[in-house]
Swiss-Prot record:
GO terms for biological process: killing of cells of another organism. The lineage of its organism: Eukaryota, Metazoa, Chordata, Craniata, Vertebrata. It comes from Naja atra (Chinese cobra). This is Cytotoxin 8. Monomer in solution; Homodimer and oligomer in the presence of negatively charged lipids forming a pore with a size ranging between 20 and 30 Angstroms. Its main location: secreted.
Length: 81
């Protein structure tokens, strides 16, 4: 009985992910990574000349400003980039 209770507690902790971390897509979207502490935004960077093709994706703490050549899109939910 104690073993069953302990198993349920462990499963609950794993499922709830008590130390929540943001998950951001990598360059190829089916793959993602958990962000480090303090990195609370996902970002997608692409060239303005080719807006449909992302150049880089990942985790970041502050969304960079876009320029004439490069555009950044940031969001704060799991796998949103």
């Amino acid at each position: 009985m104690k073993t069953l209770l302990l198993t349920l507690v462990v499963v609950t902790i794993v499922c709830l992910d008590l130390g929540y971390t943001l998950k951001c897509n990598q360059l190829i979207p089916p793959f993602y990574k958990a962000c480090a502490a303090g990195k609370n935004l996902c970002y997608k960077m692409f060239m303005v000349a080719a807006p449909k093709v992302p150049v880089k994706r990942g985790c970041i703490d502050v969304c960079p400003k876009s320029s004439l050549l490069v555009k950044y899109v940031c969001c704060n939910t799991d796998r949103c980039s």
